[in-house]
Amino acid sequence: MTLWINGDWITGQGASRVKRNPVSGEVLWQGNDADAAQVEQACRAARAAFPRWARLSFAERHAVVERFAALLESNKAELTAIIARETGKPRWEAATEVTAMINKIAISIKAYHVRTGEQRSEMPDGAASLRHRPHGVLAVFGPYNFPGHLPNGHIVPALLAGNTIIFKPSELTPWSGEAVMRLWQQAGLPPGVLNLVQGGRETGQALSALEDLDGLLFTGSANTGYQLHRQLSGQPEKILALEMGGNNPLIIDEVADIDAAVHLTIQSAFVTAGQRCTCARRLLLKSGAQGDAFLARLVAVSQRLTPGNWDDEPQPFIGGLISEQAAQQVVTAWQQLEAMGGRPLLAPRLLQAGTSLLTPGIIEMTGVAGVPDEEVFGPLLRVWRYDTFDEAIRMANNTRFGLSCGLVSPEREKFDQLLLEARAGIVNWNKPLTGAASTAPFGGIGASGNHRPSAWYAADYCAWPMASLESDSLTLPATLNPGLDFSDEVVR
């Protein structure tokens, strides 16, 4: 029984599904998808639970969320192993994900009060108040790269605001989704407040098509995000928050410490086996001898990266990709770039057939025309050389995406120019592209999102503002507008 609907674990009535470890092939999870009727059932449960949950005081909702945080802490080792085994990422990285889940709760509580709490301004004849109210029933679509942390970034602020939720994890990480749901169950979340439906495309389409849905919060690919945007077009009454991918540029302009710059680049391009939406996909490198030396060192260090299993000792920097198919897609993308005229610098290698263990790839595309403006979700870095910084910024902005952008340079003036001209929601200076602060908004523009950033700003799309003018008594104004006569004279 792998669906959680209205406080009960039930068996899915849709297609059967098996999840295996992408490296070892070990069976980790088996179950059935939710069919359309069960998705409807989950929506009815969420709708029925909404009035009571929304009417609880914030302190009461907060208490449930804090119990969930305590359970994350006490079950950290177990949840770390589940995420690592299911995604293929090393244990050390899965542990950082669970830590991020715990930290996100305190940040979400603070953001609730700062961004969507209550404010009151006294006026001579009363007060002006600002309150926030929950939307109602929200669908949350989770991604596979951070199956705990990223859905958590939607679910926690949505619950704090008083919404009820239907959560669909990625079909590639059903075990992680179920494990997190069981912790919410232990935390004492009332029936119907959070419902879990497993499944792939058909389940997702049934969920997004629900008429009685008040909104949808999505993290995933641009292609799916565009489909959801089209599906919900003409429905302005529904809140839609899309957090999508990127074709992110990293500009290497001047390098004082080559190894430090190489380390930053590897952290930007290859951490999580390149499966972060903020990963550097395009390396823009200044022409010249210094750039040549940097590139040679980058290739030399990158070719030492050997992906391994989640529990290997010593721990590898990267593990496998989410699936063998995902790894093959990266290899295919590399082959297409090479066929277009790209200059191979480091060829990606699938270490073992039937696994997702893929080494990084680096290819130079300077002067090659028609390179697709697409996100390759894996450890593949394309390199372009440039002559002037103005040219580098033009190249950085030459994409339909706009998630992250970075600059390596000792010159503050160049960063200031980039801040003015970059088309990206995250712009970093001498920091990895994959670094982001939860106390700041997380999101992009263009094909990277619909201007609904998450993290610190997630509270914004989880509640709507209600403005009020208030007075505890009613008196006739001492001064009336022209044309108003409240005298006792009788009009004849």
From Swiss-Prot:
Q: Which residues bind NAD(+)?
A: G220, S221, A222, N223, T224, G225
Q: Residues in the active site? A: E243, C277
- To which species is this protein native? Escherichia coli (strain K12)
CDD domains of this UniProt entry? ALDH_SGSD_AstD (cd07095)
PROSITE patterns in UniProt: ALDEHYDE_DEHYDR_CYS (PS00070), ALDEHYDE_DEHYDR_GLU (PS00687)
Q: What does this protein do?
A: Catalyzes the NAD-dependent reduction of succinylglutamate semialdehyde into succinylglutamate. Also shows in vitro activity with decanal or succinic semialdehyde as the electron donor and NAD as the electron acceptor. No activity is detected with NADP as the electron acceptor. Therefore, is an aldehyde dehydrogenase with broad substrate specificity.
What domain of life does the native source organism fall in?
Bacteria
Q: Extract the Pfam families matched here.
A: Aldedh (PF00171)
Which HAMAP family does UniProt cross-reference here?
Aldedh_AstD (MF_01174)
Q: What induces it?
A: By nitrogen starvation, and arginine. Induced at stationary phase by sigma S.
| Listed PANTHER family | ALDEHYDE DEHYDROGENASE-RELATED
**Which GO molecular function annotations are given, in alphabetical order?**
aldehyde dehydrogenase (NAD+) activity; succinate-semialdehyde dehydrogenase (NAD+) activity; succinylglutamate-semialdehyde dehydrogenase activity
**Full protein name:** N-succinylglutamate 5-semialdehyde dehydrogenase
